[in-house]
């Protein structure tokens, strides 16, 4: 097969010596005498006269025959050329009673002739092509070139880019220039846009392995190369090609250059005049011919390089005659009898394969199926196999409709079985996986199908199916037009809708207009727009052209559901119930006859506008399959089969009515039952180092290579949109659901926030979460606590090499944190002989009752000291009060003494109380021994505003502050859990020992934070008790950053963008009135172009944005130069 394709490439390489010049000089001259628009038709006599006019000055047999004989030969040549063009399918002729407006009454006409809108190209067997068999190949390329490619490029120049070809999805690569709507790209085309003009169903450039696509691409490439060698086209380095700059100077074909020059220089002048005229007198044709004559004579006298060569040698009378003929053929033929512009029509092409080519394609198809089964010996679903082999396109050329029926013709190779309601293709029982389908078997299969087709006539589609397809296509076009106007908030009238859907007669035909209205009413598309008080309109009684219309209630609800699904606030099940199901129900109710009809999946995708929803065909099929609606899905041909007959007692619900009871929720997905914590536990229970290594490597790959590149925008990415971008489905089994994964590393790698559009609902939905990259400082302890200690168990010895290899430590973390053993030692872990030694974790539960007793005791002592009932002492760190153990015990309330300190010996209770106070609150109660009396031990009670130890300040500012957020209130219990303070995580940590002065796990974190706040002049944190009636325990004290002194990394990032977070009832992002750079704002906010999500709290309409140009120069030209050189800036700020 590769040899045959290489041979085809060599054959299609153009050569000037092999091109059929007779076809160019004769048939193409007659072809380009016709108008370029496929809808425009001119009289046979006018085209013949123009042909003779342009070729009469260049006799074919100069010096042999006289002028009259030459004219007769030219007439015969024109008729022969037109006949040959008709046989090739490039030209079609019709005999009509109505003549175009350019015809003078009383003349006998042989009919009208026009270009064919669809050109058929015959493709023979690629294997039989030989270097000597080049004539047929050249004729095929020339037919494709001058019948489709060049006319379409010419068509774009004449009619602009308002109409684009039916482009198909492309694989990633350069942009398709043919799909652009930039006026500067009107005369540019891309190779793929020309391949899209090859009309067959299912052609897609993403299926580049499909032989049909390769055939089409090879033909287009050969045609473009042929045009490039003949200086008709010019191919650029970016893959686009344009008309050659010297195309209007070509000597052959003459009429091609003349028509190109005419449509550029003369045609627009006549068209503006015709469009302004409303008369139909025959005299007007002569008037516009006179306008064209003057314009042509003016351009001929002016001369210039763009003037075609034939006009340079014409006399004045010949120029006038040429202007008259060209006006009749090329300009006025594009208007109807009422001087209304005909709708533009673009050429297209169909490929017709020979029997040898069909055999080659079918053989390659079966071999592809065989190769796919080798990769998946357990079987392939028929829908997946249909997409793999591109069956819709292959069936159109091979002539078979059902892939299942085609495979059942080869029972020795394939076996189609039903597995749980799905058709699955498996290997046959008589042959092995290595046995390929032979060409003889495929030939017998095709021959049998061909003979059956000869014996019994083909069953054509029923009239009801054809009518249904035409009506639904009209419905989709109408909905797309009305949605576009709805998004632009532009009112639309019924006349405008008719003009868009009926371009040929501009909606003026009452019969077509009534038919259109009937269709749109049956499919529940239109509703009268009564917003302006025009409530008297009854849409059932008919509409006038000036009546305002809008989308119906059903379509309006469907549009809202589509936009909600696109903005990640609706699930797939809600999309089905609110949009898809009502539409299919409406289609089923609009059927004229009982029975079944087929809705192509492509039609449903057009109605859904899946390109805006980022919804793939496979995902849409999964939605339809899971819903189990009143239809049947044909997975081979990607159709939805609807039925109109109802069972006895069944009542069809109207399309726009809501069900009486809400439908049952869909079963929870597998990903919602799998969490990241469950997957960690599963891996650690196996106690296998290889699985642990693979698990950790997968985590790092998902974090750094998969998720972080997509969440770098400061505004974050919604979870649903992130799921579509990274295709998380393949990681669910290993790492759990995406939501649980990003929440597991919240504050280390990611920042997970709740979307403000959730309206403060108590039950949080995972789809309302927004994920962004964590931009705060990451300390060694934070990395250890949130990553290493979670993935690697601390109760067993683990090789350091395993940890370093799993984490890719040398490439990902070593540049910031140094070597791994040093970091582990800094966090209190011991390393020896290449092993991370296990640690015995000491857990000391927090006793709220003891803490409440100590806080009450401290408050009573400080109150007595404030009233000067106790003697104060001063030291280096501040003021304090010295009490003996007995005196300290005396300040304890009596009820507490009886419940907690009920020891019979008073000294023993006092000793226990003092010991607990010193250990639990070491920075408020300290041991003190007098130098004069070493036998007596005192307790030193610290008074407020005493200087705290250095370790307390370092611990709070380095470990506590990075965990805080301005808009999020964090309790001390939550901080304790994150830091692992009470679980002994800081017991062997140097920072913990310096901060606590003893064992950190036995020390109250609340006491440490309170000591820091009361002793610092400007503390970076604030403690807010929630309930004043209770003691300030762990669960009742909130910790927040002091915004006057400290700014969290998240708030700092918002400040850089001129924003702040307000907690006035609901979390809102507000401006700070600080000027920020417009360029930095645009570069960071990647999602600014997206519309606001429904329900998102935004600024009031009264907010005013100020703009200031920050440049040194006063001249606008100099300012623009500074902006280009990045020396100037534009500052924006808001006065809310």
UniProtKB/Swiss-Prot annotation:
Gene Ontology cellular component annotations, sorted alphabetically: mitochondrion; protein-containing complex
* Major location (coarse): mitochondrion
Keyword Transit peptide among record annotations:
yes
Keyword set for this entry? Mitochondrion, Transit peptide
Mark out the transit peptide. 1-97
Result of knocking out the encoding gene = RNAi-mediated knockdown at the procyclic stage causes moderate growth defect without affecting the production of guided RNAs (gRNA).
Q: Where in the cell is it found?
A: Mitochondrion
Query: In Gene Ontology terms, what is a biological process of this protein?
Result: mitochondrial mRNA modification
Out of the domains of life, which is the source? Answer: Eukaryota
Annotated signal peptide: none
- Assembly, per entry: Component of the mitochondrial 3' processome (MPsome) complex composed at least of terminal uridylyltransferase KRET1/TUT1, 3'-5' exonuclease DSS1, MPSS1, MPSS2 and MPSS3. Within the complex, interacts with KRET1.
Described by its record, this protein's role is as follows: As part of the mitochondrial 3' processome (MPsome), involved in the maturation of guided RNA (gRNA) precursors.
How is this protein named in the record?
Mitochondrial 3' processome subunit 3
User: What organism does this protein naturally occur in?
Assistant: Trypanosoma brucei brucei
Gene that specifies this protein: MPSS3
